[in-house]
Amino acid sequence: MKQQQLEELLKKKGIGPMGSKSLNQDETELLKKLLPDPDVSLTTQATMLTALLTLTPNPYEEHLIRDLHSTPELFLPSELKEFLFPSAEKSFVQLINKVISGQNLSIEEANRAMDYFFDPAVPEYLKASFLEGERLKRETFEENQVFFSRIWDASLRIQTDIPVLIHLCDSFDGSNRTRNYSVFVAALLAAAGFHCLLTGIDSVAPKFGYTSHTILQLAGKTPLLQTTKALDELKTNGWTYLDQKEFTPSLYAMKQMRKEMVKRPFLATFEKLVLPIYSTGQNYIMTGYTHPHYKEELIKQLKASGRCDKAIVVKGMEGSTHMAMHRDTICITLDGHTIKENVVSPSDYGLHITEEKQDKSIVPEVCLQEGLDAFEGKDNDARRNIIYQTALILDKTGLANRNEVTGRLQQLIDDGSAMKAFKNKT
């Protein structure tokens, strides 16, 4: 109960630099009781304290902050006092306090912060505080370059000589209001002769939505393949799935911390882009975003990193690669050094625009069955959506002609090639 109360306060206060709301008098009085409570997660307490110190306070919050400074022994766990009374020596807390004060980190400082972050001996409440502080301050482009690079370096990776490898990079916290047919898109790409790698996780905060891992498990597949076995499957069947547990175990081990800090950190932006199987030829990425800030941030980070040859970033449903069938979708492409932005529509590929509503009651079993029905020949919305996303990938990367691609993909479904590629998945 107490943990849930603090999480609810954090959901209100710790949203971000623009969306956070102030706490009222009753809420600040409740917070006084929850911050020192030993029955509440220290990670959640540290994250809440970070939000309180970072964002502009209202009068009730100002009064609480004064109480924290004057009598910290009454209102804070001993571990968190250093946030108010930092030592002079270089430490993770020193860097966190710099972020809390609204100052940006230098490249050297950002790297030092990530040294602490990936050190298993450093307490998770400090890591959560750092993530929250960066979220609320808003990471600079240079900071994000460091964060992306360090997450990339922390991930296990093997190379392949596959000429072109398409990476479907959905957000790891999944979907809980909309469909996502990524596993079927991957199978259809494979049927068309193009290799595709899916990555993800079983479940992670803040949404704990269903993922490609979920769908594969429901389909009787094995989502936890070792990287070498996944590469073998990629070569023989044209598509495969790799789980974060296999390629970035250090981040996978932080799942509980991410649950207790409640809000989405910068980890979510970059963990999906680490490409654990990497082609020595061409690597093409498709990923999605939700918030407008990340539209530009994602594509520019991909360009600056030089880690992919082409990229497609769409304003997908729930930030995924799944595009709406009932309206235009913003689509940004990267081709070498050239970035272009336009809008795309199902009608661009000869597909009917159909109504699509968010549905909080959606379950992954339904998505799996709809995808299987589509591959069995049923003319349903899933079929059109799978074709739409696959056609767009092939068109925008120059792998197929827009005027011909839809008919080709329809034929691959109708002749059973797509279902064969799906069924052959381990």
What does each of the following model-derived ranges do?
Residues 161-232:
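A generic, well-ordered mixed alpha/beta core segment in the N-terminal half of proteins
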Residues 168, 197-200, 224-226, 241-244, ...:
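General beta-strand structural signal in soluble alpha/beta enzymes
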